[in-house]
């Protein structure tokens, strides 16, 4: 699968502070879901 550069909000656990990281991941396959979030006011 082709890898894409994705900017993702990474957090160690629910409710924790998150940091934006550039991740190299593949496109979702089958029933996988890639969640995209847009951050505002940053």
UniProtKB/Swiss-Prot annotation:
Q: Can you name one GO molecular function term for this protein?
A: aryl-alcohol dehydrogenase (NAD+) activity
Q: Give the catalysed reaction(s), semicolon-separated.
A: an aromatic primary alcohol + NAD(+) = an aromatic aldehyde + NADH + H(+)
Q: What class of enzyme is it?
A: oxidoreductase
Supply the InterPro entries for this chain. GroES-like_sf
Which keywords fit this entry according to its UniProt record? Aromatic hydrocarbons catabolism, Metal-binding, NAD, Oxidoreductase, Zinc
Determine if Oxidoreductase is one of this entry's keywords. Answer: yes
Q: What does this protein do?
A: Oxidizes primary alcohols with an aromatic or cyclohex-1-ene ring. It is highly specific for benzyl alcohol.
In Swiss-Prot or TrEMBL terms, this protein is called: Aryl-alcohol dehydrogenase
Q: Origin organism of this chain?
A: Acinetobacter guillouiae
Q: What is the lineage of its organism?
A: Bacteria, Pseudomonadati, Pseudomonadota, Gammaproteobacteria, Moraxellales
């Amino acid at each position: 699968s082709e890898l894409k550069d994705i900017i993702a909000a990474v957090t160690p656990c629910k409710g924790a502070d998150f940091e934006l990281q550039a991740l190299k991941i593949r496109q979702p396959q089958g029933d996988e879901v890639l969640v995209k979030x847009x951050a505002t006011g940053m």
